[in-house]
Amino acid sequence: MTNIRKTHPLMKIINSSLIDLPTPPNISSLWNFGSLLGACLAIQIITGLFLAMHYTADTTTAFSSVTHICRDVNYGWAIRYLHANGASTFFLCLFIHVGRGLYYGSFALLETWNIGIMLLLSVMATAFMGYVLPWGQMSFWGATVITNLLSAIPYVGIDLVEWIWGGFSVGKPTLTRFFALHFILPFIISALTMIHLLFLHETGSNNPLGVSSNSDKIPFHPYYTTKDSLGFLLLILLLMTLTLFYPDLLGDPDNYTPANPLNTPPHIKPEWYFLFAYAILRSIPNKLGGVMALILSILILAIIPLLQPIKQQTMMFRPLSQFLFWILVADLLTLTWIGGQPVEDPFINIGQMASILYFSLVIFIMPMICLIENKMLKW
């Protein structure tokens, strides 16, 4: 009798995606982060659902409702901090996942890469709106500053900002719509994830050597399910350590003060995972220029397949590209550090230099080195 997982219409899809999926035998632990992102998404949806049961999206009671969750709801503090720190682990896995895609040339799988960029933008939008919900000082002023950037768009900018706000400033309508969008977006992200996987399974995974593995593949289960389970354990260890020992390590103390439109915090900054983009935004003195640089800093990923004419789908045998990749990583870490510093010398100059280096590396230097390496390899 044929196994039910191979005949049942629904089980067949799960079987071909997670059990009998032909997988390259040599993919490293860096390929674990896709499944870890799935785990992070599941954690965020479950904890978020329980938080939504007790949260009220109203400017007068939002802050109090979060306090109520932490003090009065059974394990409310754990759910709240798992959700907040879960976002940080989500972005950590996301950045490593994108970095692995760049290092091992996964951007050559165009459909998968483009859906991945859509996923990245959706997760960033969700995280931004989630940060507004506790209605603390940094929530309110972060929402004001970031939404206000749209006013830089010529002609329609101011109307667009007021349309998003639902009034003439960030207030109750803004909070209500942000909560509605924050609730629905993770389910859209789940749908996009399935499309992402669908396109990935059309072409098959890349591997560290960048060569075709069609001649030698192994089933996903039990080999990679076992390997991924170690990743899950380490992820849970990190998340639990953050939640139980250092719950406020990555948060902002200002967010424990209720939102006050009459009192601006001395230094408005987003969560750590947006600091690199925030540093790029601040390093350009012109408002419209800053907004364009901010958007381009993420959307530049979409043009990488056009910029880098790789003949080998990996950097493993291209030492010059490897060197530049790690300079890019160091540059992004520098931008993250600068984004959290006040707007004064020497941070302004360092931020400007790091921003110039970021765009130069991705648009000019790395593609040039790529061409040189192709020539050296006689390709």
Swiss-Prot record:
The keyword Mitochondrion applies. Heme b b562 binds at H83, H182. It is a multi-pass membrane protein. Heme 1 (or BL or b562) is low-potential and absorbs at about 562 nm, and heme 2 (or BH or b566) is high-potential and absorbs at about 566 nm. Its main location: mitochondrion. The chain crosses the membrane at residues 33-53, 77-98, 113-133, 178-198, 226-246, 288-308, 320-340, 347-367. It comes from the Eukaryota. Disulfide bonds: none annotated. A ubiquinone binds at H201. Belongs to the cytochrome b family. InterPro entries: Cyt_b/b6_C (IPR005798), Cyt_b/b6_C_sf (IPR036150), Cyt_b/b6_N (IPR005797), Cytb/b6-like_sf (IPR027387), Cytochrome_b (IPR030689), Cytochrome_b_C_euk/bac (IPR048260), Cytochrome_b_N_euk/bac (IPR048259), Di-haem_cyt_TM (IPR016174). PROSITE patterns: CYTB_CTER (PS51003), CYTB_NTER (PS51002). Component of the ubiquinol-cytochrome c reductase complex (complex III or cytochrome b-c1 complex) that is part of the mitochondrial respiratory chain. The b-c1 complex mediates electron transfer from ubiquinol to cytochrome c. Contributes to the generation of a proton gradient across the mitochondrial membrane that is then used for ATP synthesis. GO terms for cellular component: mitochondrial inner membrane; respiratory chain complex III. GO terms for molecular function: metal ion binding; ubiquinol-cytochrome-c reductase activity. CDD domains: cytochrome_b_C (cd00290), Cytochrome_b_N (cd00284). It comes from Lepilemur leucopus. The lineage of its organism: Eukaryota, Metazoa, Chordata, Craniata, Vertebrata. Heme b b566 binds at H97, H196. The cytochrome bc1 complex contains 11 subunits: 3 respiratory subunits (MT-CYB, CYC1 and UQCRFS1), 2 core proteins (UQCRC1 and UQCRC2) and 6 low-molecular weight proteins (UQCRH/QCR6, UQCRB/QCR7, UQCRQ/QCR8, UQCR10/QCR9, UQCR11/QCR10 and a cleavage product of UQCRFS1). This cytochrome bc1 complex then forms a dimer. This is Cytochrome b.
